[in-house]
A protein has these predicted regions:
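Hydrophobic transmembrane alpha-helices
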Residues: 1-54, 58-62
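Short helix-perturbing small/polar motifs within transmembrane alpha-helices
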Residues: 2-6, 12-26, 63, 83-131, ...
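Interfacial aromatic-anchored transmembrane helix boundaries in multi-pass membrane proteins
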Residues: 26-42, 66-100
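Membrane-embedded alpha-helical hairpins and interfacial helices in multi-pass inner-membrane proteins
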Residues: 33-38, 42-43, 76-84, 104-179
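Alpha-helical transmembrane segments of multi-pass membrane proteins
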Residues: 45, 49, 86-94, 158, ...
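Gly/Ser/Thr-rich beta-alpha loop segments that engage phosphate groups in nucleotides
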Residues: 58, 66, 124
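Short hydrophobic alpha-helical segments that form membrane-spanning helices or hydrophobic packing faces
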Residues: 62-66, 164
Length: 179
């Protein structure tokens, strides 16, 4: 019987992906009572970025795309069409962090570099999605709106991501729960 080690097992990958999806659905409840805090801390972003480093690009992209749409369908937050733009943003976070995860083994600098590249790529995709979605409804999406939504209002969440994601990835690797 050929059994893959736990850290290479597809069962582990599926389990971690399911946990990350569940966290993406539940974490916003911690900040959801005050919408301004919730949108500033970006709680759905954390499990998707983590999923990329743990499970790889395809699983994390799927978790990232499904999470905001499923949460919108079940809990009506984020509201449509914001959930659609978030789906593309989080899908990009998962995809890019997953594609760069093997580089992140080299050093802490590579881990941060991979994380920052994923965060920038996701925010750019969010901006493009907003332009397309709002363009379809004859609304405008300005550079000021992009700056406010992707950067200025998200600074607390960006800081939390830059602190927590590397700590969690390194802790899981040290515990041999991630490769």
């Amino acid at each position: 019987m050929n059994v893959a080690p736990l850290n290479k097992s597809p069962v582990r990958t599926l389990t971690y992906s399911a946990i990350c999806l569940a966290l993406a659905l539940v974490l916003p409840f911690l900040t959801g009572q005050i919408p301004q805090i919730g949108s500033a801390l970006c709680p759905m972003h954390l499990p998707v970025l983590l999923c990329g480093f743990l499970c790889g690009p395809w699983w994390a992209a799927a978790v990232g795309f499904v999470a905001p749409l499923l949460r919108s369908a079940i809990f009506t937050m984020p509201p449509m069409p914001a959930a659609i733009a978030m789906a593309f943003e989080l899908c990009t976070y998962g995809l890019v962090s997953g594609l760069l995860r093997h580089k992140s083994h080299k050093s802490l600098g590579w881990l941060y570099g991979s994380l920052i590249i994923a965060m920038v790529a996701g925010r750019l995709v969010w901006g493009v999605a907003q332009v397309v979605i709002l363009g379809l409804s004859d609304s405008a999406f300005s550079w000021a709106a992009f700056w406010a939504g992707a950067i200025a209002n998200a600074v607390p969440g960006i800081i939390v991501q830059l602190i927590l994601i590397p700590l969690l990835v390194l802790a899981l690797r040290k515990a041999k729960l991630a490769d």
